[in-house]
Amino acid sequence: MAKPASIKIRLNSTADTGFFYVTKKNARTKTEKMVLKKYDPVIRKHVEFKEGKIK
């Protein structure tokens, strides 16, 4: 069987609140680490979320 194109990743908050999102990305076309600006409900602000591994 072929390896799937999309993998699950964890987006960790840069505000160090411990909050994270889980999403998918295409590992073949998006080789760099994903950085998105999303809402962190712990501090109730939009902050950057950086890609990390799912443990």
Curated annotation (Swiss-Prot):
Keywords: Ribonucleoprotein, Ribosomal protein
Gene Ontology annotations of biological process type: translation
Keyword check for Ribosomal protein: yes
GO terms for cellular component: cytosolic large ribosomal subunit
SUPFAM superfamilies, sorted: Zn-binding ribosomal proteins (SSF57829)
Domain of life, per lineage: Bacteria
InterPro entries linked: Ribosomal_bL33, Ribosomal_bL33_CS, Ribosomal_bL33_sf, Ribosomal_zn-bd
Gene Ontology molecular function, alphabetical: structural constituent of ribosome
Family the entry assigns: Belongs to the bacterial ribosomal protein bL33 family.
Name assigned to this protein: Large ribosomal subunit protein bL33
Gene for this chain: rpmG
